[in-house]
């Protein structure tokens, strides 16, 4: 910084970049942090750089799946990035017409998910598209401590929430 005779460092990024920028500021450097994250989870921002682009990509993926899901009467689970926040999944799910949206902020009840799928089938809608945030969690898992949940996931044959959901939906 000083060797290069910089007057200011501009940092683009999410939570980690924001923390690093703040540490550099505390060391006396002039730092500007620009919020760039698809998660849209930085306090004080309405919409971060990258969020709208990520919505478009997720919407395109869900839109492309609609035809296949409808023509083959299937249940599709689309897992959307976002870590522990569901903004991207919510926006993309609503914009693309997902039938069920599961967010990390609202633990889901697998029985209610299955009931919603069965209800759609009874209404003559032979397909269902679920938009699921990667951090979505069941009500049962939400009761576990962080340590217990980590251990459960490490010992699970399901690498992501989508695999877990698919197995549960098939089982029920």
What are the roles of these predicted feature ranges?
Residues 16, 38, 136:
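Short, glycine/serine-rich, charged loops/turns that create anion-binding
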Residues 8-13, 21-23, 51-70, 79-172:
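Accessory alpha-helical/coil subdomains and C-terminal extensions
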Residues 28-64:
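Glycine/threonine-rich beta-strand-loop-alpha-helix active-site module
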Residues 1-33:
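N-terminal glycine-rich phosphate/adenylate-binding segment common to multiple enzyme folds
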């Amino acid at each position: 910084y000083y060797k290069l005779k910089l007057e200011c460092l501009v940092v683009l990024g999410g939570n980690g970049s924001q923390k690093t920028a703040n540490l550099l500021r505390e060391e006396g450097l002039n730092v500007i942090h620009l919020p760039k994250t698809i998660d849209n989870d930085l306090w004080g921002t309405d919409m971060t750089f990258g969020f709208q682009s990520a919505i478009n990509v997720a919407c395109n993926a869900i839109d492309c799946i609609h035809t296949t899901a409808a023509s083959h009467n299937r249940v599709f689970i689309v897992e959307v990035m976002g870590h522990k926040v569901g903004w991207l999944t919510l926006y993309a799910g609503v914009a693309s017409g997902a039938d069920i949206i599961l967010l990390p902020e609202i633990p889901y009840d697998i029985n209610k998910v299955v009931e919603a799928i069965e209800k759609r089938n009874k209404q003559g809608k032979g397909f269902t598209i679920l938009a699921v945030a990667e951090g979505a969690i069941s009500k049962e898992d939400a009761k576990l401590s962080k340590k217990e949940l980590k251990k459960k996931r490490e010992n699970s044959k399901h690498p992501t929430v989508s695999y877990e959901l698919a197995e549960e939906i098939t089982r029920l």
